[in-house]
Amino acid sequence: MKKLRQPTSLACFACGRKNPVGLHLEWFNNYEEKQVETTFTLSDDYCSYPGTVHGGIIATILDETSGRAILLDNNFERLMVTLKMEVVYKHNTPTNTPLKAIGRVLRDGGSRAQVEGEIQLPDGTVTAKCTSLLFKIPQAVKDKWGPAETEEWARTTPKLEE
């Protein structure tokens, strides 16, 4: 199955390559499942209670993953921001464990979209999920990002992966 890697940012906490305290995650479009995916393992540096990933980190990963689902059509001009997000924590998410986050589009209205995301354990158990309302980023906001961020986005735009 071929997956298309999504672009990354320089500064973003979730995907930013130059963010020294960032998560440095990468997302891939899974066209067969109509979802975006990332796999990762979080160390105890990201815990709340011993052995449990902090809920704010989980919310961050859900926010980024569900938000990236709108880019499944490869139209990276459609980048959106979250207006509203509801997170449900179903089980503790353990540190030092391989995890998978997936995001899907529920409804796409052009400049607004409703998306969902979830974090899964290796056995498929969902530890947390979200539903979110997204809004298209105005061009005036993107214009303030500067050339370095724009160049990074262009440089990391999709390459087919096996």
What are these model-predicted stretches?
Residues F28-N30, R104-D108:
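Short beta-strand micro-motifs enriched in acidic
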Residues S48-G51, G55-G56, G67, N96, ...:
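Glycine-centered flexibility sites
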Residues T38, M85-Y89, G103, G117, ...:
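A structural signal for short, well-ordered beta-strand segments
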Residues M1-D45, T150, R155-E162:
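Non-catalytic linker/capping segments at the edges of enzyme domains
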Residues M1-L4, P94-T95, L106-E162:
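HotDog/MaoC-like acyl-thioester-processing domains
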Residues T8-S9, V21-L23, K34-T38, L79-M85, ...:
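A generic structural signal for short beta-strands and their flanking turns/coil linkers
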Residues E37-I61:
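A conserved, well-ordered hydrophobic junction motif at loop->secondary-structure transitions
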Residues T65-K100, T131:
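Hydrophobic beta-strand-centered segment that forms part of the acyl-chain substrate-binding groove
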